[in-house]
């Protein structure tokens, strides 16, 4: 990974990790954030009535509810257990809240059983739905009041949170990893310290009453990522005296 003329890192977190764990000249490292397409995830996207009718048919328990969503495969470090405690704190004031846990349980059957037992223990059986792995995550996020990122370990980047922000849906996230870097740019008020569940509850209550304004994502875009990638290759080619990418394309 560190043998190239240049090494692209997808976040400051990964830059730090590489420098701390590999012998490499820091000048080789080039930060290039991952990006999302504004055509696929347009700001203020509204789902179709056809999709909504199908959704309510499949999940009637979500009709006329305040939807809070935690996407991500079901595993201990993704924070589904913290999410349940957040929902428990919210329903005291907003009993019409419904939490969606979106993600594949894979081989984590034991943890899934633990989560479902916690749902019963906390009296959340009418307020939580496990909807499994979904291809319509964009639509699900678009009907959500807030999307959560509660991973207990820092993520290299965290694509789902960026997709939500790009749609104009607020994100509450633990303040570490690549997700922190996204929110610093687009919604810094959504950051809370890792494990501070009461802070997540209080911020959720505040945002349900008055949703925050989100900056349009003009920073973490697919086009910008692609252009930056090409620029890295262009620079390497020029430094080696081999012309330019444009000339090579014509060959």
Give, region by region, the residue ranges found by the protein language model.
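Acidic donor-binding loop of glycosyltransferase active sites
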Residues: 142-156, 169
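Conserved acidic donor-binding segment of nucleotide-sugar-dependent glycosyltransferases
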Residues: 185-197, 205-209
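A short helix/loop element that forms part of the nucleotide-sugar donor recognition site in Leloir-type
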Residues: 42-61, 115
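Conserved donor-binding/catalytic core segment of Leloir-type glycosyltransferases
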Residues: 61-78, 84-87
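Active-site donor-binding acidic/aromatic loop of nucleotide-activated sugar
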Residues: 107-112, 125-134, 140, 191
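Glycosyltransferase donor-sugar binding loop
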Residues: 36, 71, 98-113
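A short, active-site helix/loop in glycosyltransferases that binds the activated sugar's phosphate group
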Residues: 4-31, 36-40
């Amino acid at each position: 990974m560190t043998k190239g003329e240049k090494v692209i890192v997808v976040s400051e977190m990964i830059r730090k990790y590489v420098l701390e764990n590999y012998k490499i000249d820091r000048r080789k490292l080039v930060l290039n954030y991952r990006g999302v397409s504004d055509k696929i995830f347009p700001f203020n996207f509204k789902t179709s009535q056809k999709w909504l009718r199908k959704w309510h048919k499949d999940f009637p328990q979500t009709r006329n509810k305040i939807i809070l969503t935690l996407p991500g495969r079901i595993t201990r470090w993704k924070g589904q257990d913290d999410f349940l405690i957040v929902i428990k704190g919210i329903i005291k004031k907003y009993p019409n809240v419904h939490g969606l846990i979106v993600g594949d349980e894979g081989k984590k059957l034991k943890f899934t059983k633990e989560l479902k037992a916690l749902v019963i223990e906390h009296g959340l059986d009418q307020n939580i739905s496990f909807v499994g792995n979904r291809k319509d995550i964009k639509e699900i996020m678009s009907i959500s009041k807030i999307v959560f990122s509660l991973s207990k370990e820092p993520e290299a980047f965290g694509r789902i949170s960026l997709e939500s922000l790009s749609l104009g849906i607020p994100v509450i996230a633990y303040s570490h990893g690549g997700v922190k870097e996204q929110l610093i740019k687009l919604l810094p008020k959504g950051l809370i310290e890792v494990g501070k569940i009461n802070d997540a509850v209080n911020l959720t209550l505040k945002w349900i009453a008055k949703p925050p304004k989100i900056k349009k994502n003009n920073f973490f875009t697919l086009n910008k990522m692609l252009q930056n990638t090409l620029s890295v290759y262009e620079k390497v080619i020029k430094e080696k005296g081999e012309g330019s990418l444009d000339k090579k394309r014509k060959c």
